[in-house]
């Protein structure tokens, strides 16, 4: 009977026996035949069942629910049940009735559905299969696909079938390896795109008579293992050279070989058996991923490692092996052993370009869409490759782009879980319709394709209506976007989440925020308009995407006197960009004054303390690639530091002591210096404040602030330009031309005016008020106190730092004294005013006083405090009386 069966039908019989063994049954029934038809994949029967949404997983589940699992003991020969025999006989008759003198998978399926009873029919009924429709579908396929019916098996498929029939000649290898060729036949491997050159190089090495062992060398994630998988797919598709016909690729699992080797010699014995089996079977090509692990594997005291066991076989040409490892590991483990290195022929696998990566992602898109049950927009696929290449610096294409695309799908899928059940059902129906439509077009079934297009439009209309209802329902709070599609914005959000770099599109709120950036920074930094404008322009340029992508966002030198806000502007910028001023990377360059301390920036060299700890600058930027880097007091650093900065400022990159390239392209480099302070002081005519200087402030009758005419810092634009040129000249004398030439802008800071100090005093008072608010206390400072603080804290040479000392001495110390001398409760008001001179109306002393107001305090707290005070007094009296007695 079986002589008329096609190779596909024979495979169905063999697969049905395998299914019986898997389920622990000693018979092959109609249900196992059904599973064999589905598992055959290439046959018409499998295609017809797939069209009816019948999958191997669903069918197995239903069958196991119906008949359960067997005892587990299965004989070597598994007989057919009477019903299964009858079905196979009916399959022969089905072929004759259709005028065909052979039996294919379609005839077996026709016989199965002709059998009115049986587990197979009940399973199909449970899965909702329309039997008449299925029969018509099979007949249509038979009529239109005569070539497919008679499709001969490839050499590799024949070889796999023969191995299954005769039994494997490599039992040890089968136990400790995975069959890549079988996965290729089953369609489990991802498509390999853009690796034709590398696959061709591997084939050339395999064609050699001796030392025919290619080793794929490349960075992690560039697709070394994919080259081996691509070769397996070429062999299966019969597109490889003739000498590879029928060859199988087996991936060796070194970990499982090592596992369980309790006694000396067990590991060596396993390796020897595998070598013998591969040498005896010329069709086997061994694939060893991470081949450097062979060196030292299993080498206990006095034993031989796996690499030395394999050396003789690798040189003879009968043991073909494809290895894969990274460049560093090849250099570290393989190259140091010349005898092992000469047995391998390196094949370098380079990182693909962005264009090739996009092609790879487009090839993988269907796999991700099937897994995540959604669709990917073409722009999202392109952006995944472009943004991953641009912003993820420490990994390689295509691996990082694939991970971005996968996580974007996962992100959208998780968001879709919040959708109503009806929407999920419609989205699933749309995915199924799109897949069926593509299959119909491939099979030239245009009538069904037209019906599916109409159904697709109907489903999309329902989805659009439901989306509109969701968007109008504010309680769900869903964003207005395509909820069934991964868009480029989703990819940008994944990149932003990984790196902290805002690469997504600028929202309306962020656009307004960027346009008003100067106003926001002016609220914190007083009197330095030119510096704020320059920094704001750089931020806007970077956020919109107009800056040079191969350089840092911007690089500045802040030059000017001490205490005028150079470091404060950097803190304000960090708080504006990241919400926290501690987010910036700050390095005090006075710590790098000596030559040997320069190494701390990039990490100590080998042999020195802290070699593996990384550099203070490089490690910080590696952790936070989007940040503000402040090099404070840069003129105090050793000159060799500036040599390190040249590469950062020009190319946005720096190599650390471990050889890693750190990406500085998304950092803003700010260097502060006090060079030029003397020039600014001289040109503006400012002199240090002395004790003989009279207070410049006066209060008029209405209580408004005024001041006496005194020398002012630079206000004239022509004078400011002159001072800027002089400061630049001094910087040129100190720094080398190649360093200054790489700086985007040198910003000269002004001296602070009296009014600037007045404004800064207000900011300091607000900070103190905020600290007291945390203790539920209210601070009210009289304008006369603010005048006093400004008078005491104003010094044109030393900037705002004397003001901080004045606030600490006159205000904070006085408040601390009052807080300790009198009880303070939540709601207490502290009023600070200036002590007036006796007998005058508007003259004040340099002393301040604090009045405590309990009017807003909860009366119950005051009562409890009074009771406690009386109780303490009573206890004190009693103690005194006891002492006297």
From Swiss-Prot:
What keywords would UniProt list here? Answer: ATP-binding, Chaperone, Chloroplast, Nucleotide-binding, Plastid, Repeat
**Annotated function:** May interact with a ClpP-like protease involved in degradation of denatured proteins in the chloroplast.
Q: Main site of residence?
A: plastid
Q: Region annotation Repeat 1: residue ranges?
A: 5-70
Renumbered residue ranges of the record's region Disordered: 864-885
Q: Give every Clp R domain span.
A: 2-145
MF GO annotations: ATP binding; ATP hydrolysis activity
Listed SMART domains: AAA (SM00382), ClpB_D2-small (SM01086)
Residues reported to bind ATP? 218-225, 560-567
Region annotation Repeat 2: where it falls in the sequence? 80-145
What protein family does this chain belong to?
Belongs to the ClpA/ClpB family.
Compartments where located: Plastid, Chloroplast
Q: What is this protein called?
A: ATP-dependent Clp protease ATP-binding subunit ClpA homolog
A single Gene Ontology CC annotation of this entry is:
chloroplast
InterPro entries linked: AAA+_ATPase, ATPase_AAA_core, Clp_ATPase_C, Clp_N_dom_sf, Clp_R_dom, ClpA/B, ClpA/B_CS1, ClpA/B_CS2
Among SUPFAM superfamilies, the record links this protein to: Double Clp-N motif (SSF81923), P-loop containing nucleoside triphosphate hydrolases (SSF52540)
Gene Ontology BP term (one): cellular response to heat
